[in-house]
Amino acid sequence: MSTSEIYQGLACHRLTLSGGDTVLVAMQGAHVLSWVSQGRERLYLSPNNRWDGHSAIRGGVPVCFPQFNQRGTLPKHGFARNTLWQAGEVVTTEGGLHIDVTLRADADTLAMWPQHFEAQLRVALTPGQLLLTLTVHNTEAQQDLLFTGALHTYLAVDDIDLTDLQGLGLRPEWDAVADVHGVADAALYFDGEFDRVYDAAPQPLTLQDGSSTLQIEQSPSWGQSVVWNPGAEKCATLPDMPADGFAHMLCVEAAQVFEPISIPAGGHWVGWQRLTVS
């Protein structure tokens, strides 16, 4: 089943399976706001968001495009997350539903970034699983399209002190807080601000949150995985986060941080992230 609804003033589409799994997608930014599976909310969404229709939304799954963070001249994490996308038809598949949400270059985007493009996020819901697939088309006739970005997924956890992430062991690691390069431990634990970029692992990651386990996979077309938690001190400085918000979330992002992805004229690129309750 699919329904249209207004959530905090934003136009949204909700997909619901017969077993109770649901996903809520806002047209602002093609932003996944909620994913409920096996009776539990799996994504963290800050209660302190402004919900004004153009400010970035803290939580859920922001689509960062065509720039990661502040690594360029565009607004932080690019313009896609603050821009209105267009919803397509909801499609019923074997065991699930999906919807495609599309952003095309227009006068506003071209004023910031002189590049013709089409970006599409497919949100696919099946029992116990959410698959997000970002496709970027270069609609220029001659020039290459270069971009960085991420699916900046905020996962909900009961208590960050009792949470660990496995699967990145021995992968090259950049600790952005200390600006130190190294290799990852077999299991990551979170005590204070944590902001690290890893060479993407070929195998699934496992998030252990008390008695709950979530598998996290990404396509090899993403170069990196980013793991982020602001910790108590930094969280207290974020106006769109409650003081204890850090204790209930962990970002695990499919990302392209350093070297831009290059799409030839008329070509396209596909990158996905899959979350599975296990």
Write out the residue ranges for each language-model feature.
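Beta-strand-rich recognition/accessory modules
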Residues: M1-S18, Q28, D106, E118, ...
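Short acidic/polar mixed-charge low-complexity motifs
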Residues: G19-D21, H31, R40-R42, Q115-F117, ...
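Active-site/ligand-binding surface loops and adjacent short beta/alpha elements
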Residues: Q142-S225
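Acidic-aromatic substrate-binding/catalytic surfaces of carbohydrate-active enzymes
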Residues: D21-K76
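Hydrophobic residues embedded in beta-strands of well-ordered beta-sheets
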Residues: A11-H13, V32, L97-I99, L130-L132, ...
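Hydrophobic residues positioned within well-ordered beta-strands of beta-sheet architectures
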Residues: H13, V23, I99-V101, A119-L121, ...
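Asparagine-centered strand-capping/turn motif at beta-strand->loop junctions
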Residues: L134-E140, V277
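Extended, loop-rich substrate-binding clefts of extracytoplasmic carbohydrate-active enzymes
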Residues: T3, Y7, P75-P127
